[in-house]
Amino acid sequence: MAVQSSGSDDLSGCIRQCDWDENDVCRSCGTDYSPPKKLRPFHLAFPVDNLEKAKQFYVDTLGCTTGREKQESCVFKFFGHQIVAHLVPQMPNMSTNPVDGRDIPAMHFGIVMEWDDWHRLKDKLNKDGVEFVIGPYTRYEDQPGSQATMFIVDPSGNHLEFKSFKDESAIFDSDW
């Protein structure tokens, strides 16, 4: 149910009869009814042992564009976010943790995608012959928090997860 606020004098739109402050936050229950803020891009720096192979993978396989490039690093636009590959002499060891009966790389990054976009990427990766670390499947099927997920690895051994929720309200839900 969408709740509209026109200031603390109008309580008609709230099922709890909230008393909104000047920032559209309820004084009694603390619910924030303010309009969503524009999501800012996140930044992630990660190690690679071959910058040229990393550029080829992130541009050709994932469709990223490059930004600043130096001899020891390269900036990528990763689904609207900034990631930076840093050349290192040796890659760190990677550990896994069991999740839903599978060994999930403990260190990984990725993106939560729209349902249709996730399926398009899955189809592209399959068509391009990209090897999956964990192939596309639905984690927690028919449970709260159900999500489509898949893991791939870049040429330096960094794991990437791409996931999608049919019910996006479950992304940050603590009940599952």
Report each predicted region and the residues it spans:
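N-terminal beta-strand motif that seeds the catalytic metal site of vicinal oxygen chelate
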Residues: C26-E52, H108-F109, M113, S164-W176
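Short beta-strand/turn micro-motifs at beta-sheet edges
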Residues: G30-Y33, M94-V99
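Core segments of cupin and vicinal oxygen chelate
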Residues: F46-P92
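Vicinal oxygen chelate
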Residues: Q4, G13-I15, G30-P35, R40-D49, K77, T96-W176
